[in-house]
C-alpha cells in the first residue's frame, strides 16, 4: 500500500480527532513523513478559496504522536469546505450520498504498476460534530471500470453510514 496515502489518512485522522490517532505497523516512518511535511509547510498557505484568497495556513504544533493542536478556526473552515465540496463538487446522487450529512475527501493514487490504482475516501459523519470517522480504501485495476476514490469508495461509505443509522 502506498505510504503517502497512509500518511494522508493519518494526518486527517489526527486533525479531526484532536490528535487521537490509530496505530500503524510502520508508525515511525509515517510520523517521520508527517514531521517532514509539517516543517516544509510551516506558515505556508494550505487552504485558499476559488479566487486565490488565503483562508488558512499550516499553524499546527507537532509532537512525536502527530498534530497536538490546530487553530479551531482552521478545523471549522476545513470541515465546512469539505462539506461544501461534498455537495457542490461531485454528484452525490451518483455515488449514493445525497441524503447524508457528511464531510468527505477522496483520493486516487497510482500504484507501482501501470493502470493499477488505490482509491480512498475519508468521511466524517455527521458533518456537524462528527461521531464517526470512516476510511475506505480499495484497490482497482483501470481495466475494471471506475478507479477514482469517490465513485469507487462512496457506495461502501454510504452503506456503512446507513447501517449505523439502523
Report the location of each language-model feature.
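Soluble periplasmic/extracytoplasmic beta-strand elements of cell-envelope proteins
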Residues: 44-48, 55-57, 133-137
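Positively charged n-region of N-terminal signal peptides that target proteins for export
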Residues: 1-4
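Short, conserved catalytic-motif segment at the N-terminal edge
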Residues: 52-67
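Hydrophobic h-region of N-terminal signal peptides that target proteins for export
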Residues: 9-18
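Beta-lactamase-like hydrolase cores
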Residues: 20-50
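Short acidic-glycine loop/turn motifs at beta-strand connectors
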Residues: 49-51, 127-128
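Active-site beta-strand/loop architecture of penicillin-binding DD-peptidases
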Residues: 68-166
Amino acid at each position: 500500500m502506498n505510504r503517502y496515502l497512509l500518511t494522508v489518512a493519518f494526518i486527517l485522522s489526527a486533525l479531526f480527532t484532536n490528535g487521537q490517532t490509530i496505530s500503524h505497523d510502520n508508525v515511525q516512518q509515517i510520523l517521520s513523513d508527517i514531521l517532514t511535511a509539517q516543517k516544509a509547510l510551516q506558515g505556508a498557505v494550505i487552504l485558499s478559496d476559488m479566487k486565490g484568497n488565503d483562508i488558512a495556513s499550516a499553524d499546527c504544533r507537532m509532537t512525536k504522536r502527530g498534530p497536538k493542536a490546530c487553530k479551531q478556526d482552521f478545523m471549522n473552515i476545513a470541515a465546512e469546505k469539505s462539506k461544501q465540496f461534498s455537495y457542490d463538487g461531485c454528484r452525490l446522487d451518483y455515488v449514493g450520498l445525497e441524503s447524508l450529512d457528511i464531510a468527505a475527501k477522496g483520493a486516487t493514487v497510482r500504484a507501482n504498476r501501470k493502470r493499477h490504482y488505490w482509491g480512498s475516501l475519508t468521511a466524517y459523519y455527521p458533518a456537524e460534530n462528527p461521531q464517526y470517522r470512516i476510511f475506505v480504501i480499495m484497490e482497482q485495476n483501470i481495466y475494471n471500470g471506475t478507479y477514482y476514490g469517490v465513485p469507487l469508495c462512496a457506495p461502501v461509505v454510504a452503506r456503512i453510514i446507513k447501517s449505523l443509522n439502523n
